[in-house]
Amino acid sequence: MDTLDLYTENNYSTAKFSNQLLIVGGLVLLLPFIFNNPIMADDITVAHAPVPVIKVESNKIYQQMMDDISDESKIQKFNDSVKRKYPGALIKDIDTGIKHIKLTKYYDGKPVRINIVEIDNSIAKKYELRPALSSNTDNLHSKRTITTIAKNTNSIAAVNGTFFKPQTGVPLGTLMIDNKIYTGPIYNRVALGIFDGKYETARVELNAKLNMGNYSIKIDNINQPRMLSSYTLAYTREWGAKAPVSPKYGYQIAIKDNKIVNSSSNPLDIPEGGYVIVAPYRALQPFLASKNNISVDIKTNPEWKDVKHIISGGPYLVKDSNVYVDINAQKLSAIGGKNPRTAIGYTKNNTLIMVVVDGRENQSVGMTLVQLANFMKSVGCTNAINLDGGGSTVMYVNGQVVNNPAFKGGIAISNALVIARK
C-alpha cells in the first residue's frame, strides 16, 4: 500500500470512529427519555390501549459498538505505529493487522535491503504463527521451496525456519508442532515458544528418559544425528522407516505399547506410534531382561505449560530489551560476518516481527549479527532470535518471494515459520 492509500485508509477509519461515537452518544442521551419519560407514561395511561413491549437489548448494542470502536482504534494505532517506525519505507497491507514493509538502510555507506512482516495478534485474530515442515507427511528427510511450503499450509506469509542438515533436510534443533516434539535441541540453543496469542524465548534443553519401573536412563536426543557414540537417541517414524546405523558397541530396541517388540545391533524398523532407541549395548541390557513395562518420556526444559509450537534458532539477538548476541555460548561462531539473515522477535505487546536481510551482493551487503540485533531492538523487539540464514534466507508474502535470494525463488529448505489461517 503506498502513502496515499495509507492516508485514505486512516482518514476513513477516523471518520468511521467519529460516527460510531456519535451513535453511542445519541443512544446514551435517548435512553432516559425512552424508558423514564413521564409524558410518555401519561400518554399511555390516557389512551387505555395495550402497548406492545419492545425489548431493546441496549447493553448488547452498546457492547458491540464498543468492540467495533476498539478494533478500529487498534487498527489505527497499529497503522500509525508502523508508519512512525519505518519512515520512507514501502508499506503494504497483507491483511488486517498484518503489514509488509520494505526498506533499505545504509551501514558504513553500503546498502542493506530489508523485508519485514509485522503482525498485531490482537487484530489479526484469524491467523497464527506456526512452524511447518516441508513434507506433507511429516517426513523429516525432506526439502521444498518456501512457496511450496506456504501454499501447502494455506499461509499468507512465511520465512525460512531453523537450521537443517543440507544433505537430508533433517532440522537441527528443537522443533515442536502442535505439541508434538519432532526434533530435540542441539547445544541447548535458544528457541521461540509460540503460545495462544503470545511468545517466549529461552535456551531449551531436552528432558527425556527411557523408563522401566523405578529404573531409567537419560535419552540424549530425539530424531537428531548422533554426536557421541555414548549417547542414547530416540527415533520416531518422522525420521523414516528405519533407525540409523548403531555406533560401535551399540544396540537397538524397538518399543511399542510399552513393550520391546524387536531388538538388534542392526537398524530396526521404527514402529508406528512407537520408538527405536539406539544406545550402547550396556545401557540397554537391563531393559532387554524385562521387555515389558517400558516407557519413553520426552519433555523440554523449560516445560512451557500451554505452549503450542517451538522452533529453535540461535544466537539470541535481543534478550529482555537488551542487545544480547551469545554466538560463542551457542557454538555458532561460524555464522559471523556480513551475510543474508533471517530473524524473528516480538514487542512488549506481543506484536510479532519477522525480518529477512539480503546479502552477498552490491545492492545489499548483508548484516553482522550485532547489526541485526541492533535493528531488531530499534523496531521495538523486547526479545528476538536469529534463524537460519545465508542461502536459506527467504520471505514469502501473498503468493510470491519478496526478497532477493541468491537462487531465484529460494533454495529448497527443510522447514519454515508461516502465518497461516487458524
What are the functions of these language-model segments?
Residues K299-I311:
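Short, Lys/Arg- and Gly-enriched loop/turn segments at beta-strand edges
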Residues T8-N11, S18-N19, F35-Y275:
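Zymogen propeptides
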Residues V24-F33:
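Bacterial N-terminal signal peptides
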Residues P166-I186, V190-I194, I310, L317-T382, ...:
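Conserved, well-ordered active-site substructure
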Residues M1-S13:
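N-terminal Lys/Arg-rich, disordered targeting/topogenic segments
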Residues Y275-F287:
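Short alpha-helix capping/helix-loop boundary micro-motifs
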Residues L288-D297:
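Loop/turn positions that initiate beta-strands
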